Amino acid sequence: MISDWGAVHHTKEAAHSGLDLEMSVTSDFDEYCMAQPLKKAVENGEVDEDAVDEKVRHILWLMLSLHMFDVDVERKTAVCTERKRGSYNTPAHREVTLQAARESVVLLKNEEGRLPLEKGALKKLLVIGCNADKIHSNGGGSAEIKALYEISPLMGLKTHLGGNCEVKYVEGYYREEKQEDGTNWQEDSLKDGGGTGRQEEQADAETARKRKELLEEAVRYAGEYEQVIFVGGLDHEYDVEGRDRADMKLPYGQDAVIEAVLEANPNTVVVMVAGSPVEMGRWEKKAKAVVWSWYAGMEGGNALAEVLLGEVNPSGKLPESFPYSHMDCSAHCVGEFGEEKLLHYREGIYVGYRYYEKQDVPVQYCFGHGLSYTEFAYHDLTIEKQEDAAEFYVNVSCIVKNTGNRVGKELVLRYGRE
């Protein structure tokens, strides 16, 4: 077991809880909880030496599994060998990435059969929003990777529509770059009372002017185009480790843009690219179609285009409940979120859908929600209970039939409670 970087604060507790390897963010290696403090704990009899031996065995097993060395059985020694190089960005890898992105897209809302768009009849398409032309694989902190390429939503749409459709793109909203303050939040978290900060949006007069101009441009074009897609959401100024969002509101004045564009063209499809929920109350009821795309990786733009154009039937389900507002979340309701950096998690296990169900709190979209372009019928549900002195089993089975006119996938979800 390996720790997160800078996450270990107590030596004995970490040693007794199964931690094998501590990672941190400072250069004072001897001061790490699992370094000299652990040695002293063993010498003082607070941690058993056998526990340390077990941790070493776990680390050596991993190194051996990764071919970092081989073992000379006769001499009982480790032998350094040349590690086998792997491969990356192969056609098979790209296909897996594309398929994963396809299956992750969630169709949240689709009134009047607004989606999919009819590709053959599409001659002009307006795409609005910075996230349409932005890539996100650089992650939000230590999630950063060096992707060899990434297909943006705009690029994916242009590729799949080819030369038969004119695709017009406008930014819609102004996204100013945040200035880093140089604080090492991971190192800061190791200090007493340290932790994450909060990210709040502030706009000056120049930003407000630019946003007004871009909003007016988006509204003007939205009234001229029959088919409009707004691609917004969050980015890694907000979806990032090391600091919390102050609320769930869309940044960069996007709510005002979406409202105005929907007023100009009620058929506008709204796509959210984000890794965490956002408030949708100002415009969700006005939108006929809402799609959630996540940060879908290198092939995310192609996958999104395939779903919007009906080449792929969406089958994704939400892995979490989307509240209407951050004030509906348990951490806020018990007063455990605010300016303080030290939190006590008084909500206990009642987080996410557990809290919403226990307190009967309505949500924007529930855990497991996700629509399809086709319809499925469930029948012949059977429930079998098996119980003995040691264990208790419940076997649930049913037959699922596609009753629509499109090929599709359906994920069967079973919910249980005591």
Spell out what each predicted region is:
Residues 1-29:
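Short acidic/histidine-rich active-site segments
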Residues 12, 30, 40-41, 45-141, ...:
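Secreted, periplasmic, or luminal enzymes acting at the cell surface/secretory milieu
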Residues 136-139, 232-251:
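Glycine/threonine-rich flexible loop motifs
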Residues 158, 258-265:
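Surface-exposed amphipathic alpha-helices with a cationic face
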Residues 218-221, 283:
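Structural alpha-helical scaffold elements that stabilize or flank donor/cofactor-binding regions
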